[in-house]
Amino acid sequence: PNADFQNVGKIHALIQKREAAYKQLERAQSQLESASNQLVKINSQDNATLPKSELKKTIATLKLAKLDHKTFDAYYKELTDAEQDFFDTVAADPSDKAGIEDALGQLNQYDSSLGQQADIVEANLQSVTADAQSLHAAALKMK
């Protein structure tokens, strides 16, 4: 192939869309970390009316989500490196079938692993949402 798939056309558009989604995920993760820090501070207060059980559960779920996000982030960075290696390999010698297949195989492995990690992140976010709703309901009962 003689086209620059990385920087023009449909593949480029997909890469841009993925990068925008990743940036959105990073912003959301930053908000979750801020919320987690606030909940930890609230939980450390000596207040008998605080819903301690719900607070602890939500904090634990947020901590797990943060750890799994770090793993997702590591796989994402490896995927982008493998993607760049693939594009570089194709650009260097489009006739190097073995080199291209190796680079594509590596890219596919990271893509598959990232997909699995995305499923874990999604499940964690569902748990965070459920726990936050329980905490919210318990906080409303404090009034």
Predicted ranges, named:
Residues 1-11, 45-62:
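Short, charge-rich amphipathic alpha-helices with coiled-coil/heptad character
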Residues 1-41, 65-143:
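C-terminal amphipathic alpha-helix
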